[in-house]
Design a protein with these regions (language model features):
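Glycine-centered hinge/linker elements that transmit conformational signals in sensory
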Residues: 179-182, 226-263
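Conserved C-terminal helix/tail region of periplasmic/extracytoplasmic solute-binding proteins
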Residues: 353, 364-366, 370-374, 388-443
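Extracytoplasmic/periplasmic substrate-recognition and gating elements
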Residues: 66, 255, 294-361
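Short, solvent-exposed loop/beta-turn-alpha elements that line the ligand-binding surface or hinge
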Residues: 113-127, 166-170, 201-204, 219-245, ...
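Conserved N-terminal structural module of periplasmic/extracytoplasmic solute-binding proteins
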Residues: 4-14, 21-101, 117-119, 310-312, ...
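Extracytoplasmic/periplasmic solute-binding protein
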Residues: 136-140, 145, 175-231, 278
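Short helix-initiation/N-cap motifs at beta->coil->alpha
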Residues: 71-80, 172-176, 260-275
Length: 443
């Protein structure tokens, strides 16, 4: 996986819409009529199940090619994929979440180097490469995360006597972010807030923001420095002080006492931010839907990178994907061809583009979506970051973390540290040494 993501991803899609869970099909996994082949897509995203099924029907009505869509229940995709791939009529299109997922299914991934979906990518460095350098996965959802900020609260702060900045545009490094957050925390009564940052909750609905997304930042810089592009057997003790500094900022300049973080949820943090109780909130482009529903206006929020003091001057937002299309190399040539034609139609036809960008609310990396406008202010900021030639987007290297258990152990160590029941050395141990433990267990 290429370390840089400088090329513009293009104008991206609207915020995701939640829909009821469904798992349904239509058509057969057989070769189809007239040698056209057929398509069987095992979908990973339950929230988009209905939309995929409707889109499959549209394609069948238009082309006569049978398309079956089946959606795995949340948290069961790997298990269901294993079961379905063992059947005679196996999925022709399936998904992996990145390099670790690829290792599980690399015996089934066709070469997509010459495919239209790969050729239509704005930034081909985002594609997933196999062990031999071939393209084995094409991302169809691109997302960005960082520190979301309330423009109104920041503006109110800059108007105070002695404010350390005159504009949010001056927050371009960790040192400035810390000075602003520390000062806001001291003057929270003047600002009408409860803390500079929303609660860093470690309930399961929120802990991924820290054990995965925040931990990704020091991991990214380590992998960038050592030119690591595939999951390593071990990692080094690098940038741990930087990791500690940003986490300390989150839990010190906060709306919530450290002793209460274990029970704080993702909804708590979202609500605190939407109600103006905090100026800063670590999350991503997907958060806009909930914030908008809570009454926030598009012109009142923005997003900046998670600065940790390594290469702040050139750091962009954390941009990547956990959703890669793969074509099953074990099915017939006719079905492989039919599957690639279906995906080409999905990203190029008006019906397909509308389904992805509006109905499913996906942010897409294809040139065919460059004319798609968005009213999501966080995606607008992501576009600016991606299109800024002076910035390098932070890769989603957490996709190379060896296991879910690795993340859980790290998260527990971070919570213990935050609550005062553990020390930072335990976090370093969970981050560095447990990587090798979990990698060895998986291999």
């Amino acid at each position: 996986m290429n370390r840089t993501m400088k090329t513009a991803v293009g104008m991206l899609a609207v915020a995701a819409m939640a829909v009821p869970l469904a798992a349904c099909g239509g058509g057969s996994g057989s070769s189809g009529d007239n040698g056209k082949g057929s398509v069987y897509f095992l979908n990973f995203k339950p929230e988009a199940a209905d939309q995929w099924t409707a889109l499959a029907k549209e394609y069948t009505d238009e082309t006569g090619v049978q398309v079956k869509v089946q959606t795995a229940a949340s948290g069961t995709y790997e298990q269901q994929l294993k079961s379905e791939l063992a059947k005679s009529e196996a999925p022709t299109i399936f998904q992996v979440n990145g390099p670790v997922g690829y290792q599980n299914w690399k015996g089934y991934t066709a070469d997509l180097t010459d495919s239209d979906i790969y050729k239509e990518m704005n930034d081909q460095s985002l594609a997933l490469k196999g062990d031999d350098g071939q393209i084995v996965g094409v991302p169809y959802v691109i997302e960005s995360y960082g520190i979301i900020y309330n423009k109104d609260i920041v503006a109110k702060y800059t108007a105070l006597d002695g404010a350390v900045i005159k504009s949010a545009d001056e927050i371009k490094d960790f040192d400035t972010l810390k000075k602003v957050a520390d000062d806001m925390q001291k003057r929270k009564k003047d600002l009408g807030i409860e803390g500079a940052f929303t609660s860093a909750g470690f309930d399961s609905s929120s802990d991924w923001r820290f054990k995965t997304h925040l931990a990704n930042i020091p991991l990214y810089y380590q992998f960038k420095k050592d030119d690591i592009t595939a999951p390593p057997a071990s990692i080094k003790d690098m940038y741990m002080d930087n990791f500690k500094n940003i986490f300390d900022l989150y839990i010190t300049d906060s709306t919530t006492p450290k002793t209460q973080l274990s029970s704080k949820t993702g909804d708590d943090a979202s609500s605190e931010f939407a109600l103006g109780k905090a100026a800063f909130y670590q999350n991503g482009t997907w958060a806009w839907s909930d914030l908008q529903k809570a009454g926030m206006k598009a012109d009142s929020i923005g997003m900046i990178p998670i600065y940790i003091g390594v290469d702040d001057k050139t750091e962009g937002l954390a941009t990547g994907s956990e959703n890669y299309w793969c074509i099953n190399s074990k099915v017939s040539d006719a079905n492989q061809k039919a599957s690639l034609e279906f995906l080409k139609w999905v990203i190029s036809s008006d019906k397909g583009k509308k389904a992805l960008s509006e109905d499913m609310g996906f942010t897409t990396p294809f040139k065919t979506f460059n004319d798609v406008k968005t009213d999501n202010p966080l995606i607008q900021d992501a576009n600016k970051s991606i299109q800024n030639a002076e910035l390098t987007q932070v890769a989603w290297d957490f996709s190379m973390m060896p296991s879910e258990e690795y993340k859980n152990v790290l998260g527990q160590a971070m919570l213990n540290y935050a609550q005062g029941t553990g020390d930072w050395n335990a976090v370093v141990d969970a981050f560095v040494n447990n990587w090798k433990t979990e990698y060895d267990a998986a291999h």
